[in-house]
Amino acid sequence: MAEADAAVAKAEAANAQADLSSSEALIAHLKLEIAKLRREIYGTRSERKARLLEQMELRLEDLEAAATEDELVAEKAAARTQTIQSFQRKRPSRKPFPDHLLRERIVIAAPESCPCCGSAKLSKLGEDITETLEVIPRQWKVIQTVREKFSCRECEKIMQPPAPFHVTPRGFAGPNLLAMILFEKFGQHQPLNRQSERYRREGIDLSVSTLADQVGACTTALRPLHALIERHVLAAERLHGDDTTVPILAKGKTVTGRIWTYVRDDRPFGGHAPPAALYYASRDRKHEHPVQHLQAFTGILQADAYSGYNELYDPSRSQGAITAALCWAHARRQFFELADIAANARRGKNAAAISPVALAAVKRIDALFDIERDINGLSTEERLRVRQEQSAPLLAALEAWLREEHSRLSRSASVAQPIDYMLRRWDRFARFIEDGRVCLTNNAAERALRGFALGRKSWLFAGSERGADRAAAMTTLIMTAKLNDVDPQAWLADVLARIANIPQSRLPELLPWHWAAEMEHRKVAA
């Protein structure tokens, strides 16, 4: 009797724990969905929200795993009793498996006789189908292209078709394999040594030097497309520019190099030109690099306040001065850090006082962002009209308020620095009031550099300056494909298979936006 009571108590406790874990997981799931929906509807107002979403997703993973563990414990405990029913967890509904997935039908053999009376007179009433998602391990194959030799009995001439084309000299790899190697290295940030190890576990011995040989040859083969994308980007009316660090090995030591990006995206002001991202690498951050990169560009450059761009804004520039526009998200971030109540609370004893001025500045800047969300994607003229009517009064009030607060504050006040940063560059911050093409933020360029931030964690450094150049060139291709909603690996595979045989005049057909249209046309025709 005591054992039965103990089993019941244990089962009840297990059910309670499973119920609690399930509730926590469900709450976390719903909070995450709400946060994602708010982000889609209202846009991203701060980097902190992006980080918060990542933290919520990680927390949800742990809670889901814990809830499943507790549910299984409750099932086992309930099975040892006759009075306790096992806890049944309420899970968020799962999406059905996509229709395009291959279905393998396995029919369980029908019974030959009735298990109740033994009769063989059975008739089928219907069927129930249980679907199980499974993965097929990657398949490798060797394609043997047979070239038969023939001789002419009249003139004894020997004939044989030419050898099949390979993308790379001394080539042995097909375009799909090459595309996978390139995308995993430059799109998924998997170094060649890790790829080589994984292939070896799958029974394929491809050394790092062999893979590197293929990568170098593919980069050379794809250079013409990189040149076309470069020309397309630099022909833009407005560019987003930014840079980030990348460690580069150089003669036994590591130097802090830079990756520069210039993003063309006309969609916010209703432009129809395809978006594209251009990358360059350098061993330092000297001003000569952006000057060289943008020597053929004339238009608007949205960037940070890096002094290396100043030569581009010089009215005496031979190609014509580039118009500077600064990023409001960058300015807002400086105020937000002084007004972040949650972050301040986490500092505990080291917390600094929340700045009321910074908090007020964030609210005033957010009012401008609210207007921008409503005009995103409208024409240049319509955006300018709304800004003149709605944003201009707010901007004038913000400038007057900042100047008044700046005159009151001590130079040592923490909030004085971001105010001074804005006021000394006010004409560049106010550029969006004069031109509907200007965006309020430089987020397009910052997003384009996130891959390199992730890459630094994976591959730590670029192996050489040429390696950094190669990474910049390949990332140009991959990111441009992504910006046009094109699968980079599928695109690279098709391009590598065709690029050697296509005339120079038709190379633009292989650009991601033209390629996507061609694939869609083929799909419709089929």
Residue ranges of each PLM-predicted region?
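Short, flexible loop/hinge motifs at secondary-structure junctions
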Residues: 1-169, 240-241, 269-273, 303
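Catalytic center-proximal scaffold of phosphoryl-transfer enzymes
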Residues: 28, 50, 64, 69, ...
